Structures are given as structure tokens and as C-alpha cells.
Amino acid sequence: MSTAQLVVQHLPYLRRYARALTGSQVAGDAYVAATLETLVNEPETLGRSTNVKADLFRVFTRIWNSLSVNGHSDQVQHDLPAEVRLGQITPLPRQAFLLSCLEGFSEEDAGVILDVDVSKVRDLVDEAGRELAADMATEILIIEDEPLIAMDLEALVEGLGHNVIGVARTRTEAVKIASESKRPGLILADIQLADGSSGLDAVNDLLKTFEVPVIFITAYPERFLTGERPEPAFLIAKPFQPANVSAVISQALFFQQSARRREAHNA
């Protein structure tokens, strides 16, 4: 398989990381586009190692950090929404946290990507975990038709200090629970539900009445990370690792709370 084919193979996961880092599909995809443009113009930046995925993320990180400070790409800046201002100052600990917990990179690979040593990666991940866990407990609605997965998710989020207001197996149940319970501060949603209904449709129904961050869970993430249509900013692949879910929940709540603080400040 050629290097170009390997890069294409890893793009869905780079998009996932970029969107989690910025909290936005538009912003994340803009940084990915800038990374691909760099690879086209400067193919030598990818290096000659056998770990193409780590090299791809390393190039992305270089672009991310340079644009965050200098904003030298007018095209990318014009594509970025207002909320990406927060993403542009996302600290190094959060990058280490997502690389390790969301993308599953080893400490060694995360160190190469971030240009730090392994001990620094460990310190950064620990720091991010403390930072993101602070003062973020919320009510969570789970939309999942597989009982065992629903039980795992419920135990996981409660272990993080959150409260599950209900578990829905269908679109109709999700709307009913949301209308009869305390408004959720976060939704975890499968995409394909038991009765053939869609978790996407269930979420869209709920978002008509209130705004809430949503994390989608699917066995086919590549179908929803093509960059060709409106897509989830937060996506977890099945089978999932508890650390992945924890990382994405923390990130989603972080961006939600930061957005509210900015709104209050600007009011």
C-alpha cells in the first residue's frame, strides 16, 4: 500500500481527533485540510518511518500549533467559526489526553507527535484528566438499543460522577424520557436503534427544543467521518474503550461550559 493510500486510510481518525480538539466539525476539518495541503506541497514533512499514522498526526500538530499562534493561513482562518477561538488556545495537556485516550497512541508515539518525552506525556495526560474532570458533573441521556452496551455506558458515566436520567432504546423513548425528566446536559447516542429508527433523528428531535452536546457511538465511524456532509463533532467507535468514552465526554462538556462562559461574558 502506498504512503498516499495509508494517509487516506487514517484520515477518518485524524478528523475525529481534530474535531474533538476544536469542538467543531468545520474547524477540525479546516485544520485537516491545511494538513493535507502541507503534505501535497511538502511531502517530505511526512518522514520515512513505517508509522504513517503517527507521522500524519505529527504534521497536523505542527500545523495546529503554528496556526494557533500565527494564524498565517487566511483560507483556514476564514473557514473557522467563532467558537474555534477557544480551540486555538487548547493547551498541550488536552492534546496529550486525546492522543492517548481517544486515539489510542502509545506514550512513545504521543511523545513523537507532540515533540516531548514519555515522562512529559504522562504528566500532561494526568494534568488534563484533573482539569477536565473538575466541576463537570451533569445529567446524561443514553440512547442505545443493546442492553449490555447501555449498562456499560451507564456504569461508566456514573463512575465519572454524572447522573443518568434514562436509557432509551428507540427514537420515541428518547423523546419521551427527555420530556419527562430533567433536561440532559449531555447525550450519548447510538446511530442505529432497535426498531429501525435512527439515533441521529432522535437527537435532531431533541435539539429542536434545547441545545446540548451530543456524542454519537457507532460501529461504522468511517461512514460519518468523510468530510462530505454535516457530521458529528464527537464520535466514538464500537467496540469502545472506557478511556475513550471518558476523554470524549470530558472534551464535549469542556467546550459546552466554555461556550456558556463566553456567552455570559459577552452578555
Swiss-Prot record:
Pfam families referenced in this protein's UniProt entry, alphabetically: PhyR_sigma-like, PhyR_sigma2, Response_reg
Biological processes per GO annotation: phosphorelay signal transduction system
Knockout or disruption consequences: The growth rate of the phyR deletion strain is the same as in the wild-type strain when plant colonization is mimicked in vitro in the presence of succinate and methanol. However, in planta colonization experiments show a severe growth defect of the phyR deletion mutant.
Signal peptide: none
ATP-binding in keyword set: no
Domain named Response regulatory: residues: 139-253
Keywords noted in UniProt: Phosphoprotein, Transcription, Transcription regulation
Modified residues (4-aspartylphosphate): 190
PROSITE patterns assigned to the protein according to its UniProt record, in alphabetical order: RESPONSE_REGULATORY
Role noted for this protein: Key regulator for adaptation to epiphytic life (leaf colonizing) of the bacterium. Positively regulates several genes including katE, sodA, hsp20, dps and gloA. However, it is not known whether this regulation is direct or indirect. Also induces several dehydrogenases.
Name assigned to this protein: Phyllosphere-induced regulator PhyR
